[in-house]
Amino acid sequence: MSLERELRQLSKAKTKAQRSGQLREEASVCHQLGELLASHGCYAEALREHQQELQLLETTDDPLGCAVAHRKIGERLAEMEDYSAALQHQHRYLELACALSNHVEQQRAWATIGRTHLDIYDHHQSQDALQQAQDAFEKSLAILDEKLQGSLPKRELSEMRTRIYLNLGLTCESLQQVALCSAYFKKSIFLAEQNHLYEDLFRARYNLGAIHWRRGQHSQAMRCLEGARECARVLKQAFLESECCLLLSQVLLDLGDFLAAKRALKKAYRLGSQKPLQKASVCRTLKYVLAVVQLQQRLEESEESDPEVAMGICEQLGDLFSKAGDFPKAAAAYQKQLRFAELLSRPGPELAVIHVSLAATLGDMKDHRQAVHHYEAELKLQEGNPLEEAKTWLNIALSREEAGDAYEVLALCFQKALGCAQLAGQPQLQRQILQHLHAVQLRLQPQEAPSTETRLQELKAAGDEDEGDGEDEEDEEDDDALEATELELSESENEADASPPLEEDEELRGCLGRQRVNKWSRRNDVGETLLHRACIEGQLGRVQDLVRQGHPLNPRDYCGWTPLHEACNYGHLDIVRFLLDHGAAVDDPGGQGCDGITPLHDALNCGHFEVAELLIERGASVTLRTRKGHNPLETLQQWVKLYGKDLDSETQEKAAAMGRLLQAASLGRAPHSSQAPQTLPSNHLFDPETSPPSSPCPGTPEVCEASTRVSQGLAVSTVARPRRSRHKVASSSSSEGEDSAGPSQPTQKRPRHASPSLQTKAPMPGPASDREAATTSTSWAAYREAIRGVGSAQTCRLGPSPLRGPSEIPIPQAALIPQEECLAGDWLEEDFPMSPGHRGRCPARPQSSGDGGRHRASGPGSDTARRPRAQARQSRLPYLESWSTPVRADRANSQATEPARSPDVPRVVAPTGENPTTGHLPGQVLPPPIRVRVRVQDNLFLIPVPHREAHSVAWLAEQAAQRHYQASGLLPRLSLQKEGALLAPQDPIPDVLQSNEEVLAEVTSWDLPPLRDRYRRACQTLEQGEHQQVLQAVEHQGSAPTFSACSLALRQAQLTPLLRALKLHSALRELRLAGNRLGDGCVAELLATLDTVPGLTLLDLSSNHLGPEGLRQLAAGLLGQTTLQNLEELDLSMNPLGDGCGQALASILRACPVLCTLHLQACGFGPGFFLSHQVALGSAFQDTKCLKTLSLSYNGLGPTALGPVLGSLPAHSLLRLELSSVVTGKSDVGLTDPVVHYLSQEGCVLEHLSLSANHLGDKDVRALSRCLPLCPSLVSLDLSANPEVSSAGLEELLSTLQKRPQGLSFLGLSGCAVQGPLGLDLWDKVVAQLQELQLCTRRLSAEDRNALHQLLPSQLGPKVCTLDQGPKLFFRHL
């Protein structure tokens, strides 16, 4: 029904109620009208209806109705952004609800108030509003828990709780409380799913997706938004789905996936929007994306065939990206254009234009140094063209100005630009150059500005020329570039009118461009295949059809999830059973973005206990851990802990039963289905997306439909579960910090051997002896012993046969696995070790195995085990054609059967004799050396694996740890992963890795002995002698939160082992290194240490020979990091920093958000320090909301620079300011003017001011005195070492203090020309107005001392402390 029709009907009903005098009925219609109008954005009209509703209900004396009307009026006012009036009505609503003792309305009132405060924060960024919002939501939740539990229907309670959790999650996100935010969102999503509250579920998933996007967690954001989009479809709200598509397109644009972004934007465009601005935004963005896609496709086609065309396309792409504000992509496009141009040997002017584009783009990216580099390259190419040289020199000057270079460098560039412009005869350009130069001179060199202004006046006669044609033309060209996409956009509109294509085809269309690919490789925006989608949607028939048609079983989406993961996540039991029957990887830990979550973890994390039980029956490991270190039992315990309060008794019983099952399984007592085949992953030589699917071994019986259950309590689990961020479901259980920024390559775990009780009875070819039958009944331990020496076609394992203890009886092993122990989908090769005294050979018979792509060599059984032989390993072979004939070996050699190899793969035969320590035998061919690349954090190590003895993954991890220690001084404990799959420490390296492969080492913990031992070990590693004083310091301060190594004059070589020893010293809060020789060369080591001690609150680097280059290194290392997030005090005093370090200092200030104290004494700052970097430093100081103490003493800033410095300081928070000796001589007059201006401004809270040694006189003290009443917070003033200040200045100061409500707690006048006798009256004022006075002058008389001693006992008695010795006369109130 249209809005107009609904409004007409309600208006008629309202008129009818008015005529009949039914006030309550009329109020009800007003309420409906208000809600309808508000839902369509007509807030003012809705407000009038609710106000009329309130008047009618007040007439009828309906307090509850009035309360609800106040709530609605408040909501409408909040939507109109009149928050103060909204809060008045909402608090009135709360008062009425309290008066009625209506807890339901009280709960709603607090929730509504909290929502309004959250809106206030969104508009005004008020932290107070945020805190009030949190308080209101918590009160609402408390009422729900304490008053309403059990008094309302469960669904209504869940709906209330869902919305409160969502609002609390949003509030915690704004408060940057990440853990609480995640927990609240998980609870909200869990309850919304459990109770099918799709509107609330949409809000939770959409908001969580936006949060993930803002945090840069693109993979999780995409899945949350797809989940929200699914809710919008269920609700049949096209506008909501359009919003999801629009935000999803922004995520995809961040990832650089323009094709996927185009599809999302087209959907948003077709679905439409309520908001005209949003519709225009969709249209504009879609035009841009279509243009980019078109250009990228053309570039791909012409890149190799026609470099000249490709060069032009790169330029168009760069221009397009630049206009859209995506400067990194623009710079990459221009760089590519430059490479093509150099390849084609284009003339200099053409190359120069590209350098200009690059320089301008880098300038937009604030990389001004690199921009200067490209301008200089352009200058060389434009040599001989004075006009272009002039423009380039101007650009160089402007870029250097942005980079913060000194005035001398800038002036030289401007002069060269001016000279070239004069040579080219361009008065307008000369004028432009002089205008820029004049602005720079006013800022940095005011004395030179008048002459430049005179030259400008002389050029004015040249007149103004039209300056805009070029820009207009450029805009027109850009518009033309975008207009070319109108055709495709109109096509998308026509699609909306025509019959829409199938959703599945729309989702999976064209992700790989025009390239023809395997039909099973088609994917949607998040990398999901047809099988993924069928598993998510619970379409068992569709899953069966796809698998029977040959769809791969274990493909991964871009995040790394397999179809089995999705089926377990959604709780589709029949689909899980079917996938397991056909060989799905039961213990797949997912890809890089999956946190090591196996299907069993997934099912438990979502509360699907029946699915979890089935997985355990099929041999799922109950000991595998996620990257966070949780095994399945711990995952279940976490799930119960998070949702325990919201679970009913039945679900709690099911969770307890599942816990008992997991405990029993971990002890080896779990029941297993004897009829369910355990099909393991197919050969990992094959790409799981393109290889043939696995099928059961021939003769494998079908799985029985009714399988054994642990208990009846686990038969059904309908509890809605928390979701991980994935397509069609909101993020809840995945790690907040894990992303998959792009498509991860499909990976597959090595085959995992399961218990014999889980295996299928499959007939095996070849005879089986009685001894084989006896082996069938052996225990699991015996089975593991039997397969310990097993090799595979992918391994090249060297080593002796397994050793048995003296009491163990050798169990003769058969050549074939007995039928009842068959590993469906896996196989054992003919490579058992052979006992001494037996030799022979068994003919190999190719036998098709269950995976459809591997072959098994089997033969008659033997009573003796055979030695393993090594084979070359080759990854991702398209197929294995055949097996070669067995190799006959002599007494020392075992027999070996090897696959045929391509000529470039070396054939390896490694004989194994009786004694593993014997040397190589004649005729032995050594295998090629294995080198493995191991990435540990930011370091990549190439580690050789010697063949002389078998090395395990644990050995490789130890080697990598030692190399990391040598490089960084930290010894980690590592676990190794390959393509997201954890490598077991005991596995031999050749079994799981091949040469030149890269593995990722994850740090599980750090080896951190006591600080003294770490220091000694670091000295040994660096071959540096131990410094005895440092050794004493680390012994005495090893466990203290403060570490000090001050005034030891340690050189860089001596500081390096100390800094390495302090890494990961978690107790460290204060680090004092004053009085050493850190210099610029040791800054990298300091940064590496600071990065590992995030709890540091104080850093003292004073007097350390730290120069401007070292400070720049420190700033660059802190950029974008959270290293000094908790730093409260920083001391850089007495370092030769100079005027050129302003930009670096500004970056450091931004990297320390809670900095309270900053010491910059005697750093060699002059007037140019602040004036050269006024914008950067001013902005940085203004943003230091917590700064309370600043010391700039002993820097020759002068009065000229002091004014801008004080103008940029945060007067509302700064409490202590030290400006001692900031003038260079008596000629620097006017220092007090900027100080007086600072003290007189409104909101100044300064408490202590130091102006000692600044050549001040009585006139300056008089000026300071006049502003004291305007700054009542100032209670401490240091004017010492100013010999021009006399008794007159003191008297003027004391007279002014009488006009204030309080005097001063401290006044320092040591070294001033105060001359006695001062008189009893003046001393009386001193005692009355000052809590502490410090006088140190030889001009005081005996009368002054007597007067002070006479006054103090009479007025203060014993509550005073005095010092009267020589020229010193101090007193202090106690």
UniProtKB/Swiss-Prot annotation:
GO BP annotation list: double-strand break repair via homologous recombination; replication fork processing
TPR repeats: 27-60, 67-100, 107-140, 162-195, 202-235, 242-275, 311-344, 352-385
UniProt KW keywords: ANK repeat, Chromatin regulator, Chromosome, Cytoplasm, DNA damage, DNA repair, Leucine-rich repeat, Methylation, Nucleus, Phosphoprotein, Repeat, TPR repeat
Gene Ontology CC: cytoplasm; nuclear replication fork; site of double-strand break
Keyword ATP-binding: no
SUPFAM superfamilies, per database record: Ankyrin repeat (SSF48403), RNI-like (SSF52047), TPR-like (SSF48452)
The UniProt record lists the keyword DNA repair: yes
Stretches with biased composition (Polar residues): 672-682
LRR repeats: 1065-1089, 1093-1121, 1124-1147, 1184-1207, 1243-1266, 1271-1296, 1327-1350
Region (Disordered): 460-508, 668-777, 829-908
List of residues that carry Phosphoserine: S711
Extent of Low complexity compositional bias: 731-744
Biased amino acid composition, Pro residues: 690-699
Membrane-spanning residues: none
Subcellular location: Nucleus; Chromosome; Cytoplasm
Acidic residues composition-biased segments: 464-507
Sample GO molecular function, one term: histone binding
Domain of life: Eukaryota
SMART domains the record matches: ANK, LRR_CC, LRR_RI, TPR
Mapped ANK repeat ranges: 526-558, 559-591, 595-627
Subunit structure: Component of the MMS22L-TONSL complex, a complex at least composed of MMS22L and TONSL/NFKBIL2. Interacts with the MCM complex, the FACT complex and the RPA complex. Interacts with MCM5; the interaction is direct. Binds histones, with a strong preference for histone H3.1 (histones H3.1 and H3-4/H3.1t). Interacts (via ANK repeats) with histone H4; specifically binds histone H4 lacking methylation at 'Lys-20' (H4K20me0). May interact with DNAJC9; the interaction seems to be histone-dependent.
Main function: Component of the MMS22L-TONSL complex, a complex that promotes homologous recombination-mediated repair of double-strand breaks (DSBs) at stalled or collapsed replication forks. The MMS22L-TONSL complex is required to maintain genome integrity during DNA replication. It mediates the assembly of RAD51 filaments on single-stranded DNA (ssDNA): the MMS22L-TONSL complex is recruited to DSBs following histone replacement by histone chaperones and eviction of the replication protein A complex (RPA/RP-A) from DSBs.
Entry comment, domain topic: The ANK repeats mediate the interaction with the MCM complex and histones, while the LRR repeats mediate the interaction with MMS22L.
Family, per entry: Belongs to the Tonsoku family.
Name the record gives this protein: Tonsoku-like protein
Taxonomy of the source species: Eukaryota, Metazoa, Chordata, Craniata, Vertebrata
